[in-house]
Every structure is written in C-alpha cells, then in structure tokens.
Amino acid sequence: DSTWDATSPRYFNDGKYKVQNYGNHNYGHISLARATELSSNTAYVDLGEKIGISKVVDMGAKLGIDSTLNPNPSLVLGTAGVTPMEMAEVYATLANGGVHNDPYGISEIVGRTGKQLYKVQLNSKQVVDKKVASAVTEVLEGVVENGTAKGYGCKYQPVAGKTGTTSDVK
C-alpha cells in the first residue's frame, strides 16, 4: 500500500504545470483509494506521471475510448473530450469483471411467429484482470460511501461512481 502526495497546489513538468485540488484542499499523503474518494487532482497527476501518460492512453483504448486522447499530464483529470457512450463502456467493462463488449442497442429481434430474426454477436474480450477490475470497482464504491459522492448511494444495491469538476459550462 503506497501513499500519494495530495498536497495542493503542486507543480509538475519542471514547474510549468500547476495543479490544485478542488477548493485547493490539502490532503497530505493518502492512499490512492482515498485520493479517488476525495477526487484529488494532485495525486492523480502524480500517478499519471509515474506510470506514464501513454499507458493511460493505451488503457483508455482497451476500455472502449475511441476518441483521440492527447498524452499530456492533464489527461488523468478528465480533460479529454470523450463521449458519454465511451465513459459508459469504461464503467461497464469494470463492472463486468474487466470484460469489454462493444455497445449495442438491440440484443434480439423476434418475429410474430416467435422465430428469432436477429441476435447480437458479442465480441467479448478480457482487457483488465478480473481482480484488478474488482479492486477498482471497490475503490469507486468508496467514492459513494465515503467520498465526494457520499449520500448518493442506494440502500439496497452497491453503487460505484466518480465525481469531477469543470470550469466550463457544457
């Protein structure tokens, strides 16, 4: 279990890139799970730099992001223009134990006589280890239980999520 520097503000890219947490909150050194719960920008930019932004781009593609992702430090903060469908693919892949399926609108068509006229052909692919997908999902459940989405859970079913902020009105 490692800890990440979630102090705010922090400077990256030889001092050229200033990153702050929302409200400039200073969280100190915390686990990655807690950084996710608190939506710590500084910890995630640090993580992205340490693992390499190109690996983040590659993983995004495996999880279902087809949009062009520019490999810069702010990418880990959600600055790329991805579609809601792509984000749904990412979260569906994690919830599906790391197995990716291309999205589809119609799973089956049955005629009046009951004959199956069409059935979707899934192209399932394990893109993330099942244990890793489970661990990530557990961390995202923590966002709803203990973090920035606290109070938005469901009493009768597990809920996972991730919050974020924007400076743009979209």
Model-derived features: positions:
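Secondary-structure transition/capping motifs at alpha-helix termini
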Residues: 1, 66-68, 96-101
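Extracytoplasmic/periplasmic beta-strand context in beta-sandwich domains
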Residues: 2, 7, 73-75, 104-107
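Conserved catalytic neighborhood of penicillin-recognizing serine enzymes
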Residues: 2-56, 100, 114-142
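Short acidic/histidine-centered micro-motifs embedded in hydrophobic/aromatic stretches
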Residues: 6-10, 59-63, 108-109
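Mid-domain, small-residue-enriched loop/turn segments at the edges of structured enzyme/sensor domains
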Residues: 16-21, 52-89, 105
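A penicillin-recognizing enzyme superfamily signal
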Residues: 34, 38, 83-88, 93-170
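Thr-Gly-centered strand-to-loop micro-motif
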Residues: 46-47, 77, 161-163
